[in-house]
UniProtKB/Swiss-Prot annotation:
Protein name (record): Dual specificity mitogen-activated protein kinase kinase sek-1
Annotated function: Dual specificity protein kinase which acts as an essential component of the p38 signal transduction pathway which is also composed of upstream effector nsy-1 and downstream effector pmk-1. May phosphorylate pmk-1. Downstream of CaMKII unc-43 and adapter protein tir-1, plays a role in determining asymmetric cell fates in olfactory AWC neurons during neuronal development. Activation results in the repression of odorant receptor str-2 expression in one of the 2 AWC neurons. Involved in resistance to pathogenic Gram-positive and Gram-negative bacterial and fungal infection.
Organism classification: Eukaryota, Metazoa, Ecdysozoa, Nematoda, Chromadorea
SUPFAM superfamilies from the UniProt entry: Protein kinase-like (PK-like)
Subunit and interaction comment: Interacts with nsy-1. Interacts with unc-16.
Length: 336
């Protein structure tokens, strides 16, 4: 007689699905309530009450203008974005709104006031800064000034602290660190902006490859074999390129004519470094060298960078005044 084997019940397996990142929603009107500081009272701002003072910048996303509120005299930067260009642009806009809304307690990120909808555009209202790093360093070199090491250290410290806040508190990677997205004001503050292409991190990795400005991209985002995923160390590379650019007055890579030239120069050739004769300290040169490690596994993340001697010097530097230097350059340029 053939015995039938008993069916063995497998132990129950609990499948844990990752918590999906919520997609920010947009429910805007043609007016919004804003607070200039955490302590100030809310003021209602209507789009029709804003007067354009000057254009601050423009790009594929839209335009940034300096505006003034008629009734209160409040001046702000307003980023006007077409809300219905395409799905990708709308996603970028929602990313920016989401990041801005959650960044209020970070002094190294441009302060978000509010957002409103006006004639097919989304208006993102932010604090106005006095200049961007790309305009600033070019102005400085144009009038015969160079960018001193203490400035570079304090700028890098602010940027890393802002990026670290994005990672730890917002679970975001910026993905477009470059001089035009680093803003300065006459008080000596340095803040990062433009979170439109920032990406959510899954297990500390970002998966979208097309976001960002190619001249500042690290090897792992260009090389076809490795660009499927990357982490915050991609922004560390971009910061290293930014530091060299403002330190020597020009981007460390020549202009690329073809994608192959970019692949060859960034992926295949040694990384750029500060010239030995530039007069920068050993700690500064080592910091930049570590930011530009070709193998991202060897490249430090934010906590390690913040613990380096160059950052410690920037923290403790008391003689150099960011505000004084920024005002000196801006005043000289505007007098010409």
């Amino acid at each position: 007689m053939e015995r039938k084997g008993r069916e063995r019940k497998l132990p129950g397996m609990k499948i844990v699905m990752p918590t999906p990142v919520e997609t920010p929603t947009m429910n805007l009107e043609d007016r919004c309530l804003i607070k200039l500081t955490n302590e100030s009272e809310e003021i209602e701002i209507a789009a029709t009450d804003l007067v354009v003072l000057e254009e601050l910048g423009k790009g594929g996303y839209g335009i940034v203008e300096k505006m003034q509120h008629r009734q209160s005299g409040i001046i702000m930067a307003v980023k006007r974005i077409k809300s219905s260009i395409n799905d990708q642009s709308q996603k970028q806009m929602l990313n920016e709104l989401d990041a801005c809304r959650r960044s209020d307690c970070c002094p190294q990120m441009v302060r978000f006031y509010g957002a409103m909808f006006r004639e097919g555009d989304v208006w993102i209202c932010m604090e106005v800064m006095d200049t961007s790093l790309d305009k600033f360093y070019r102005h400085a070199y144009k009038i015969g000034k160079h960018i001193p090491e203490p400035f570079i250290g304090k700028m890098a410290l602010s940027v890393i602290e802002g990026l670290n806040f994005m990672k730890e508190q917002l679970n975001l990677i910026h993905r477009d660190v470059k001089p035009s997205n680093i803003l300065l004001n006459r008080h000596g503050q340095v803040k990062i902006c433009d979170f439109g292409i920032s990406g959510h991190l899954t297990n500390s990795m970002a998966k979208t490859v097309q976001a960002g400005c190619k001249p500042y991209m690290p090897p792992e985002r260009i090389d076809g074999e490795t660009k499927s995923a990357y982490d915050v160390r991609a922004d560390v590379w971009s910061l290293g390129i930014t530091i060299i650019e403002i330190a020597v007055g020009t981007h460390p890579y020549a202009n690329w004519k073809t994608p192959f030239e970019q692949l060859k120069q960034v992926v295949k050739e040694p990384p750029p470094k500060l010239p030995m004769e530039s007069g920068f300290s050993v700690d500064c040169q080592y910091f930049v060298k570590r930011c530009l490690e070709k193998d991202y596994n060897e490249r430090p993340k934010y906590p390690e960078l913040l613990a380096m001697p160059f950052m410690e010097q920037a923290r403790n530097e008391k003689q150099f005044s960011m505000a004084r230097f920024i005002n000196e350059i801006l005043d000289t340029v505007w007098r010409r």
